[in-house]
């Protein structure tokens, strides 16, 4: 007797349907596996053919514990970001490996490199073969904080964004140190008496917030005078830290869900909306009266941008991607300088003597620019604590990089469309082959006869080089020179080692606890 004859008809049909369903699932799974294997095989054959056609060597591979998906490196990165040891983790990834190697990031080919020549090629020679948009905007990594801006787009859209922000970085702006005087006066007034411990980092952040808002919006927020206005500064810190996590996750940012980050974004948006609404209202009044906006008393960046962009959300996006990252750059840079000087009193004294040798001379841009040892201190800080730890680009057409292939790593490598190249600048800046056995040491004297090129790239290079370098240098130099005219020595009051918390770049987790002495 058959099984079918012993079962009720309904039960038999149910079993039959279930069997057909399971067979279908098996068939679909089998077809998927076959298709995947076929696609991978064809892709590998095509890649190898192109690699050989370009005369390129094989790229060494990272020794994954999970070679299929690369979850080991994904989870390692996530853990390091969550527990604030990303810089340590990144250095360990490069330990005992060639200077260029291939990483599997959940199916996406990442090429990690610390070769200056590859940085040069990606940033300057073949820069149009690479793009930032797929890494930042196309996958909504910066949304809802911002959309289009100089840091997130390519091509003509990037050229337009660059046009919008150009006045902020013009020579007349960064050479005018008088715009800093009042705000530095206020910082010096708020520093405690001789020998009292102070975490100077939040104070510097408020100082730079005051400086930046004056230049961007035509009026300073004056958070040093009105501390209750400072929360916008801390909201920007939260936004930047969230952005760093989202950018690191690449196309898997759906794993990032933090309501606190969205709340911080809302705080920043409300603040900017008020300035944008005021500016558009003033522009409309100018136009109603038949006046030329270029002849207005206002010469701040927002006025210029609003005159050339009439879409409120688009304007807010553009200003977000300048205002928030820029506010973190100089303040954290100065914090890093003071963190190091507090641990090297001899360097502080040598730098101070150079400042005192100026007498009562005005601290103009030209004067500060010619202070060799002060600038060496700035460069050494940039080297050990670059604001941009990595430079990441997605390849948008098949191309090559000059080195990294073959057994000796000297052959060019083939980079196919869709590959992601990550130059780890923090590792380059500490490479013993470039900087010597004391590469980890803070030693400004190394800059006395040093003329670096692509092995020192704190602001990137090529057409997309960050235009803020001279602005940051002028602001940091002026602040430090004013401080050194007042305080004879500096002392560290935090014995803990540096722990880098990632935002745009790293900042010390515990701040900068120091004591300053006038005598």
Swiss-Prot record:
Its cofactor is heme. The lineage of its organism: Eukaryota, Fungi, Dikarya, Ascomycota, Pezizomycotina. The keyword Heme applies. One of its GO terms (molecular function) is oxidoreductase activity, acting on paired donors, with incorporation or reduction of molecular oxygen, reduced flavin or flavoprotein as one donor, and incorporation of one atom of oxygen. It holds the Pfam family p450. It is an enzyme of class 1 (oxidoreductase). CDD domains: CYP52 (cd11063). Its main location: membrane. Pathway: Secondary metabolite biosynthesis. This is Cytochrome P450 monooxygenase apdE. It is a single-pass membrane protein. Belongs to the cytochrome P450 family. Heme binds at residue 466.
